[in-house]
Swiss-Prot record:
Primary localization class, coarse: plastid
A single GO molecular function term of this UniProt record: quinone binding
Keywords carried by this UniProt record: Chloroplast, Membrane, NAD, NADP, Plastid, Plastoquinone, Quinone, Thylakoid, Translocase, Transmembrane, Transmembrane helix, Transport
Organism: Olimarabidopsis pumila (Dwarf rocket)
Entry GO terms, CC: chloroplast thylakoid membrane; NADH dehydrogenase complex
Matching InterPro entries: NAD(P)H_OxRDtase_bac/plastid, NADH_UbQ/plastoQ_OxRdtase_su3, NDAH_ubi_oxred_su3_sf
Pfam families: Oxidored_q4 (PF00507)
Function: NDH shuttles electrons from NAD(P)H:plastoquinone, via FMN and iron-sulfur (Fe-S) centers, to quinones in the photosynthetic chain and possibly in a chloroplast respiratory chain. The immediate electron acceptor for the enzyme in this species is believed to be plastoquinone. Couples the redox reaction to proton translocation, and thus conserves the redox energy in a proton gradient.
Protein name in the entry: NAD(P)H-quinone oxidoreductase subunit 3, chloroplastic
Length: 120
């Protein structure tokens, strides 16, 4: 007898939800025709024949802007639930959120001073 009988539905759901994608990939692999040709090996750019080399070097500045964007995007994700329940949480949660924002502002000032936000 299974000791955690109340989890039977959970395990059944987990097994079924794991089996469905595996079966979908197996069935599509078995039923799909395999045709290799020059068109399958070429790059696809919105229906236009690609011109030039597909491998481009990106400047490191794009990386720095993306990194700063991700940091502040994650900040927004963390602050949104706090803002929705601001009136319930009280002063201690406000002080914690204020400390969180101040740490992120310090990080922004540091990145600014290091020149991470300058495009030159």
């Amino acid at each position: 007898m299974f000791l955690l009988y109340e989890y039977d539905i959970f395990w059944a759901f987990l097994i079924i939800s794991s089996a469905i994608p595996v079966l979908a990939f197996l069935i599509s692999g078995v039923l799909s025709p395999i045709r290799k040709g020059p068109e399958k090996l070429s790059s696809y750019e919105s229906g236009i024949e690609p011109i030039g080399d597909a491998w481009l070097q990106f400047r490191i500045r794009y990386y720095m802007f993306a990194l700063v964007f991700v940091v502040f995007d994650v900040e927004t994700v963390f602050l949104y639930p706090w803002a929705m329940s601001f009136d319930v949480l009280g002063v201690s949660a406000f002080i914690e959120a204020l400390i969180f924002v101040l740490i992120l502002i310090l990080g922004l000032v540091y990145a600014w001073r290091k020149g991470a936000l300058e495009w030159s």
